[in-house]
């Protein structure tokens, strides 16, 4: 093994170790899930381990992740609600490793030397480990974390299957396509777009009846299977289906973007490098523009504005994004470049659809989720640029210093975005997780009373997802805005007087410490605890009837 290749493997191991460490950091604050959806999967896994069967009363795309969590809980003898965050840590670290391995293969197939390919793979894994937005999405314990891993694997295996026509690769592709709809709906849409892009690119290179019928039928069959599964799940069972209704609301628009994807995958790999760079910067610049404008006024009515701290960290990410523009030659090779090209254009298609469909919180969520998948090919492009700078001919001392300075700038600025993974996006506070004190308060209200209770968005989601409590937060939001005190059991927190109560998708609302103390003094406090964010459970004095009993808006 050459010295360069050995150094590359050392960097890869160090980068993956860093990925695991950063994704384990939420466990420092709490062993509970760092995302509210995680409590729903924990409930599903808990029910499955206790009864021996998975409840078919939730979403149609959480079957694989919930089953996986159930198995891990049984094997480790851990309660699912405590096992889910460590599981996410492991899967998130594996994603970075797989991303690095795929990047190495892409460079090798594009004609780079073994040492260069290994170096790019190592840098890619390290960038994925530390880049703030990607770190955030590969730290939270939900089914998308499996979806991201499967999308990378599918793109790699399908491209090899199309190139080699070997049966073993087609078997792996077939297995992946079967499990996608049951794993994560949004990732399934990304996967379908990746399949479409790779098939179109393959046909454009090897135009023949065989190339059109074989891979073309596969792409059409997967789209048909995906929609058929979700239609069956929605109409024939008690399972719910997210995201699909957003596409079906504008089918013509989605088809138009699908056609643009098919044209784009061929155009990108045949057009000039300067045109590609301008087009890339326009696409990426639109994302930064949206975040910036949202800091002034919500782009999507009814959603919260971007906090200044979040805006600053995202702006720093611009160094990473601009650097990627100088590695776009990676898109030019069919043998290797088709993989990152398809993985880039697939989420761009979803982002374009979301921005042109409707200015609503649902489509805002669609755009934000799609950008996660952009970071994988972008990290490969940045890896190419950094390795090129490091391997450039020595030249003058000033030239070497400049190149090392540019590499340091990219790495330091990327590390500086890491806090994005741990911040609560609407309040820009750390950590973005559920404290033990919060969970204890929710457990008390949910298990010691049969009556409905109220709180902010975060705590009501925990109650509804894990304890299946009857909850709501509209009356609390009304009180925080100057309305009457809620006539129900309320879980309140000290943070309501500082960072505010979470009322997603609306902006947080605060109450003064004095007003909060006076309010709790006028109610019967039935539970209180201490901790990082003390919780108080109180009910109104007298025999007030909870008017919000039917309010289940969570």
Indicate where each model-derived feature is located:
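Membrane-embedded transmembrane-helix bundle of lipid-linked glycan/lipid transferases
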Residues: 1-426
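Extracytoplasmic
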Residues: 97, 132, 392-399, 408-554
